[in-house]
Amino acid sequence: MGECSSKQKNRVAKKQQILSILAMGNSIVGKTTLIQAFEKKSLEDIKSTVCTQFSLVKRKVKQSNGEDVEIKIKVWDSPGQERFETLVLNAVKNTQGIFLVFDITEKESFDDLQKWIKKVEEAKDPKSFPFVIMANKIDLQSKRAVSKEQAKAFADKYNFPIFETSAITGAGVEEAFQHLIQTVYDSNQGKSNNNIIID
């Protein structure tokens, strides 16, 4: 019986957690390209997302004992159009972390971050899970419409970490995603969470 119990524990240990994170932001800010850059996929033929869809990736995170463990992450891509609001709200309810994306060349996408935070509040307590802001398209510095200072002031207001990213060059992408994933993993350890799946 002891041997059987040991085998069962080993099987459980080999199973992986599946965490869920969600991209939010206006249409054409680069949410889909950021996710594909994170997956190391080709950026050709990118189209606007017209429904919530996800990619499944694997990454290593640090456990409390300092050792690495591999987990799976569902990275949900949400549409930025108003008509898909219900889909977005449903996705928020089933996520453990959110990355808010704006385009540094489009001031409106930055101003609308406040709107996206309010949408989160309609579905879930925003203090119950971590956020990361991605200031995207830094490869287009000559067209920059939102300064680093403006973006940092907004992030500081909510105490959200902010990363400057480019899906084209890959700058900041891995760091931003890895920060959010590690934070989500840390915040869910020891919790009973119905949104965490064991595979």
Regions found by a protein language model. Give the residues of each.
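TRAFAC-class small GTPase G-domain
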Residues: 1-192, 196-199
